[in-house]
């Protein structure tokens, strides 16, 4: 069965606000680039929304502007950060300003779920420029650190985590609700723990930072499209979405490389793409 995929709006929100979502769970790609944002692609960010509990997985460089086309920041249920590399969390800073000074105010603080040790790292970063100190974050965010070995429940959704093979502690995330599932690899080299987390997922968002045949010096912390396809095949997922790829890679090359390995639906991520789950 072909994946149900469509493009979101490119000209900003409708006059009355962001698009009204139905009860169908949807995955919206707000950022698909690797560490360098491009004119047409922000860094990593993904909105999973079942119409009741919109959850953002990562909020990388430039992604907030895209995200606002699909969900106002005052209605977000939570932000979950996979690891503390800037291209996965840095737009928490402009989000803080939006929550503090924007026209749409929340009635409660926004829960932000960070990996272990993430709170101290974020506060250290903020201390370099914010005179408010710790209050810069705590006045709008409810900062929490998840336990990667435990199940995180956010309203009706459940999230599970797995360690990945990356340069710093990083965690893949599996979102589930009412039989629908999305697994996000975060940044990782091929890893059996990620495969197990992704087992039989409806959608497997997997990074494809490296080009086929490209090697990293020292420890390997990223994957190729072939690696992603092999993990998708091993996990038995329905759809593979290749993401977190750089400007050197083309959609055609990524698709062709993965299609030699994985027989299911393959989508090369680009910003504003919306998938029904």
Where do the model's predicted regions map?
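Catalytic core of the metallo-beta-lactamase
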Residues: 144-200
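Active-site neighborhood of phospho(di)ester-bond hydrolases with catalytic His/Asp-centered motifs
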Residues: 56-60, 77-84, 115, 183-186, ...
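Conserved beta-strand hairpin/beta-sheet module of binuclear metal-dependent hydrolase folds
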Residues: 19-71, 170-186, 203
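Divalent metal-coordination and catalytic microenvironments
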Residues: 27, 46, 58, 67, ...
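Acidic/polar short surface loop at catalytic or gating sites that assists cofactor/ion binding
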Residues: 101-141
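Active-site metal-binding motif and surrounding structural segment of the metallo-beta-lactamase
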Residues: 61-113
């Amino acid at each position: 069965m072909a994946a149900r995929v469509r493009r979101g709006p490119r000209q900003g929100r409708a006059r009355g606000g962001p698009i009204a979502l139905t009860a169908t769970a949807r995955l919206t790609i707000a950022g698909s680039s690797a560490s360098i944002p491009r004119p047409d692609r922000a860094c990593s960010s993904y909105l999973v929304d079942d119409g009741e509990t919109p959850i953002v997985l990562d909020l990388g460089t430039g992604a907030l502007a895209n995200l606002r086309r699909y969900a106002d920041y005052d209605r977000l249920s939570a932000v979950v950060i996979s690891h503390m590399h800037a291209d996965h969390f840095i737009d928490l800073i402009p989000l803080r300003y939006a929550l503090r000074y924007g026209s749409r105010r929340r009635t409660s603080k926004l829960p932000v779920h960070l990996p272990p040790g993430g709170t101290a790292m974020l506060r250290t970063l903020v201390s370099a420029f914010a005179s408010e100190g710790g209050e810069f974050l705590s006045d709008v965010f409810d900062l929490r650190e998840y336990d990667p070995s435990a199940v995180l429940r956010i309203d009706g959704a459940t999230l599970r985590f797995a360690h990945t093979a990356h340069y710093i502690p990083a965690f893949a995330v599996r979102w589930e609700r009412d039989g629908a599932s999305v697994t996000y690899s975060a940044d990782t080299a091929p890893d059996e723990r990620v495969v197990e987390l992704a087992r039989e997922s409806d959608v497997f968002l997997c990074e494809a930072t490296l080009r086929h045949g490209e090697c990293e010096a020292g420890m390997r912390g990223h994957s190729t499209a072939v690696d992603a396809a092999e993990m998708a095949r091993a996990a038995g997922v329905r759809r593979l979405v290749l993401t977190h790829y750089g400007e050197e890679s083309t959609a055609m090359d990524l698709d062709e490389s993965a299609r030699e390995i994985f027989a299911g639906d393959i989508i090369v991520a680009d910003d504003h793409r919306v998938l029904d789950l």
